[in-house]
């Protein structure tokens, strides 16, 4: 069965790019969110297998959304996908339960690899 994925990024271009990579590789994108608040709401409704999460977004940033999702579902598989690759931010994301961290710009293979790691 194809992995069900939620994409969260405030940039439409990035959501479209991720969706194209994922669907071309046989994964199902079940939802898209443009901020962390939407991501938390859609996660509860859609129960995706994997969430791609940007960090810098309006209303609720990706780290706050990661914490909110993981507080409701400790097994949530969240992959941070952001241009912010500073060590402290990576560490904070991992400490709060992110399963992977991808720095933009990325190679499409890296996105596929992150989904394939999800059990």
What name fits each language-model region?
Residues 57:
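Receiver (REC) domain active-site loop signature in two-component systems and cognate sites
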Residues 84-85:
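Short, conserved "switch-loop" micro-motifs in signal-transduction and mechanochemical regulators
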Residues 35-38, 61-64:
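Acidic catalytic/metal-coordinating carboxylates
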Residues 46-52:
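Active-site beta3 strand of CheY-like receiver
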Residues 12-31:
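Two-component/phosphorelay signaling modules centered on CheY-like receiver
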Residues 88, 106-115:
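C-terminal output helix
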């Amino acid at each position: 069965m194809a992995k069900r994925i939620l994409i969260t990024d405030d940039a439409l271009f990035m959501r479209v790019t991720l969706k194209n990579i994922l669907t071309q590789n046989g994964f199902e994108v079940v939802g898209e969110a443009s901020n962390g608040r939407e991501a938390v709401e859609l996660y509860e409704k859609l129960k995706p297998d994997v969430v791609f999460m940007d960090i810098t977004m309006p209303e609720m940033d990706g780290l706050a959304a990661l914490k909110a999702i993981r507080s409701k579902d400790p097994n949530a598989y969240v992959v941070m996908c952001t241009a912010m690759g500073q060590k402290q931010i990576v560490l904070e994301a991992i400490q709060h339960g992110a399963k992977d961290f991808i720095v933009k710009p990325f190679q499409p293979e890296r996105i596929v690899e992150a989904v394939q790691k999800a059990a």
